[in-house]
Amino acid sequence: MAKKVEKLVKLQIPAGKATPAPPVGPALGQAGINIMGFTKEFNARTADQAGMIIPVVISVYEDKSFDFITKTPPAAVLLKKAAGVEKGSGEPNKTKVATITRAQVQEIAETKMPDLNAANLESAMRMIEGTARSMGFTVTD
């Protein structure tokens, strides 16, 4: 019989840098799972994506065992990396901080496709463009 999921924990952790310190430790401690076991496994799985923030969904079972699914980095993180900026605009409608090309948007949309609720690449690109605009980026052809 399949194990019963007791709790789902969602976190965003820098790839390869999970530690028992907050925010990871307290979130996992409340769920009652082995914090060191999770951090070692997460760091091993995400070592190749250093520098990115990786969303993770941890399923905690009744017997306190767990497994987790890593997702693709948030669109905002990928956009900032592609544009080479530290952060988006505080006033996106007035102040534009960077320019990004449609080719870069397409590349990000292809990366994010498994996690996006989009039927095709074109709609995924529109989602990414919307995120870029809300961050104060200009999208050019």
UniProtKB/Swiss-Prot annotation:
- Check the UniProt entry and state the signal peptide residues, or none: none
Protein family: Belongs to the universal ribosomal protein uL11 family.
Coiled coil, from the record: none
Origin organism of this chain? Streptococcus agalactiae serotype V (strain ATCC BAA-611 / 2603 V/R)
Q: Cite the entry's keywords alphabetically.
A: Methylation, Ribonucleoprotein, Ribosomal protein, RNA-binding, rRNA-binding
**Which protein, by its recorded name, is this?**
Large ribosomal subunit protein uL11
Q: Which domain of life is it from?
A: Bacteria
Q: How does it assemble?
A: Part of the ribosomal stalk of the 50S ribosomal subunit. Interacts with L10 and the large rRNA to form the base of the stalk. L10 forms an elongated spine to which L12 dimers bind in a sequential fashion forming a multimeric L10(L12)X complex.
Stated role: Forms part of the ribosomal stalk which helps the ribosome interact with GTP-bound translation factors.
One Gene Ontology BP term is: translation
Q: List the disulfide bonds.
A: none
* Keyword Ribosomal protein appears in the UniProt entry: yes
Question: What GO annotations for molecular function exist for this entry?
Answer: large ribosomal subunit rRNA binding; structural constituent of ribosome
The protein's PTM annotation reads: One or more lysine residues are methylated.
Mind telling me which GO cellular component terms the entry cites?
A: cytosolic large ribosomal subunit
Keyword presence, Protein transport: no
Gene that encodes it: rplK
